[in-house]
């Protein structure tokens, strides 16, 4: 029986509807963790004042480019900027790892007929979290590098790497073995993988644009809403990719 996008979409929506509460709770929980980690690791108010105190001087050179802007900063400002970037990157990475492991284990537990919850699914994913951490870090670096060069290489890399988290969890395979298998399967079934990845990327951009227009005065609440909706989209994509891999393996 051929694998069609309509079949995968229907199966994905059925699972999402049946497990909506657990998926929503997991999306919000990992969003809270991301925001809290980012807040805890970010520079203090005094350190941020170093950047804001000279914002008027730096704003005049924004048009010259990002690298020129960074070069014109003082060493103290560069250090604060690096800490901000590192905090945001690490917090997002931890949130993505917990979400990925939790969603994939939720699918497996439900498929085995076990009653589960968001917390139990995340806890059950503990043996895979370290491997997922390195995998997602590597995938993120590769995709962002591709996006910086040109958009198309980044999208192609996202497609190639899309099945690797599923393979790591279901097959308990190594990182590079999962990437190799994912690349082969993703491009062999491009009609099923490419539309899903492109829609996922577009949905994330749309969420960013829409949420930024909402009348929410609290930056923390805005961050939780943005991360929560983004996590929900990623969770649905993971369900789609898990179902696709199960059909391909069968």
UniProtKB/Swiss-Prot annotation:
The keyword Secreted does not apply. GO terms for cellular component: plasma membrane. Belongs to the UPF0259 family. The keyword Transmembrane applies. It is a multi-pass membrane protein. Pfam families: UPF0259 (PF06790). Signal peptide: none annotated. NCBIfam families: PRK02868.1. It comes from Pectobacterium atrosepticum (strain SCRI 1043 / ATCC BAA-672) (Erwinia carotovora subsp. atroseptica). HAMAP family: UPF0259. Keywords: Cell inner membrane, Cell membrane, Membrane, Transmembrane, Transmembrane helix. This is UPF0259 membrane protein ECA2305. The chain crosses the membrane at residues 20-40, 90-110, 132-152, 156-176, 192-212, 222-242. It is found in: Cell inner membrane. The lineage of its organism: Bacteria, Pseudomonadati, Pseudomonadota, Gammaproteobacteria, Enterobacterales. Its main location: membrane.
